[in-house]
Amino acid sequence: MAESGSSGLEEKLAGLSAGCGEEPQQLSKNAKKREEKRKKQEEERRLKEEEKKKKAAATAAASGEPPKESAADDEEMDPTQYYENRLKALDSLKATGVNPYPHKFLANITVADYIEKYKSMNVGDKLVDVTECLAGRIMTKRAQSSKLLFYDLYGGGEKVQVFADARTSELEDNEFIKFHSTLKRGDIVGVCGYPGKSKRGELSIFPKKIVVLSPCLHMMPRQKSEGSAVPTPWAPGMGRNIEKYVLRDQETRYRQRYLDLMVNHEVRHIFKTRSKVVSFIRKFLDGLDFLEVETPMMNMIAGGAAARPFVTHHNELNMRLYMRIAPELYLKELVVGGLDRVYEIGKQFRNEGIDLTHNPEFTTCEFYMAYADYNDLIELTETMLSGMVKELTGGYKIKYHANGVEKPPIEIDFTPPFRKIDMIEELEAMAKLNIPKDLSSDEANKYLIDACAKYDVKCPPPQTTTRLLDKLVGHFLEETCVNPTFIINHPEIMSPLAKWHRSRPGLTERFELFVNKHEVCNAYTELNDPVVQRQRFEEQLKDRQSGDDEAMALDETFCTALEYGLPPTGGWGLGIDRLTMLLTDSQNIKEVLLFPAMKPQD
């Protein structure tokens, strides 16, 4: 039936094409032979398809099982033609006075609640006197005959079968056939009917009425599996295999995230996990009497971190502004003002490279805790992260494909306490170095340049001491940090906002937490001496003048705030995107960002 209709449509289109524009040219003998051969092959293919459908329907009828999903004829056509056909069908429907986009549909129960309410029914049972109304998106369509069809209706990530039988429908047979021929995969529909279980034991709704709420005009990616079973749910801490996704093309998945969420069941769980991560952090900090605040995202000075900012312009004030690279300075001003425990979860913007672990726009949590130091924050970090992993996964160990999905996953253990390594001591031991104590000297800079050359550690200009140290630490220390590891006691030259170490001159009370060789967390005892802070800013200006545009700028407003007195304070920052990557076995940061930064399409 569908094949014949498709063939007839093609003939009509061909006739319309022939009837307009230029006179059709006469075909040569060879061209005629090729055309006749093509038509013969199409006819043979059509007959074979019809025979296959008849056999499949007969087999399904004999076994009492619904047929497996097969590609609808119109889904075999070119996607552009499919879209145009759907637009025409929509116009025809509107011409009859039917609104394919109704304002309201009263769904009295969700798909999840429907499953919970009726899952205990016996095989073959039907509650014909009960009426339930569901709404969702059709993801698969299977026809046993023109009067018996099966749909998989998805709502809220859950699936229920729609058992559409002409005998139980309010429509006459011819209307039933016509209506269901127009229903396509991807359409959002409302279904009113009674609950029951099929002979195979699948919970279903037997519709008396189906209402199209929003038609899908584009061809949907086809389910990889012919069956209609919901895949085993993915859970945080488990490994993933994107090769099993229905939609696998990365460009399409990231640019059309709505489509990714529609057809890749697991992706919804990834972003639900991200939401749970944020909720856990918020609940944890609220439980410690922290106050959540909001600070400006546009600043006159790009301060609080060493990074290249995005620049914008305020027309009314005729002034340059910078998108924030960190909320740190504002949050510490609030602690000066007497808000002893504050935190902010929000976006930061850095005009830097895009790679597997970096996106120009990313999410962090920063908190500041008066009367605490970095030792307190180490303990707090261990408690928070180990507790989060335990709550989300049921244990402290997670699986992560650090070397690609084609290789076995590694195990990352969040069991507290975490490993700690002293930055300079460990670097000197591993690289057999004897780094000069005065890191601000030319001697130290020359020594580190030679060390990088010796071990073939690349450090593009400007080769400041800070950048050289950072590259060496990345090469030697970070590579050892698979399980959660604190790298502690950074040099002052690397930490302009951190307080000097109370017993080790030249160092600061700072730590960075690395997991799977990537930084996840950064914290320190805050520098609260305004004189020393101003000196540190001035040292950063020298690096900026040397060409390091990531060096911090001098913020007079912040220095003035420090002059009013900042209590002993511990400051802490966490990258939520990278943490979510670990908990969801994601090797690309774009996997955990709903709308990641993408290059313009050609």
Curated annotation (Swiss-Prot):
GO terms for molecular function: ATP binding; lysine-tRNA ligase activity; tRNA binding. One of its GO terms (cellular component) is cytoplasm. Residues 1-78 are annotated as: Disordered. Its main location: cytoplasm. Its EC number is 6.1.1.6. It catalyses: tRNA(Lys) + L-lysine + ATP = L-lysyl-tRNA(Lys) + AMP + diphosphate. It is found in: Cytoplasm. It comes from the Eukaryota. One of its GO terms (biological process) is lysyl-tRNA aminoacylation. It comes from Oryza sativa subsp. japonica. Residues 38-53 have a biased composition (Basic and acidic residues). Belongs to the class-II aminoacyl-tRNA synthetase family. PROSITE patterns: AA_TRNA_LIGASE_II. This is Lysine--tRNA ligase. Keywords: Aminoacyl-tRNA synthetase, ATP-binding, Cytoplasm, Ligase, Nucleotide-binding, Protein biosynthesis. InterPro entries: Aa-tRNA-synt_II, aa-tRNA-synth_II, aa-tRNA-synth_II/BPL/LPL, Lys-tRNA-ligase_II, Lys-tRNA-ligase_II_bac/euk, Lys-tRNA-ligase_II_N, Lys-tRNA-synth_II_C, NA-bd_OB-fold.
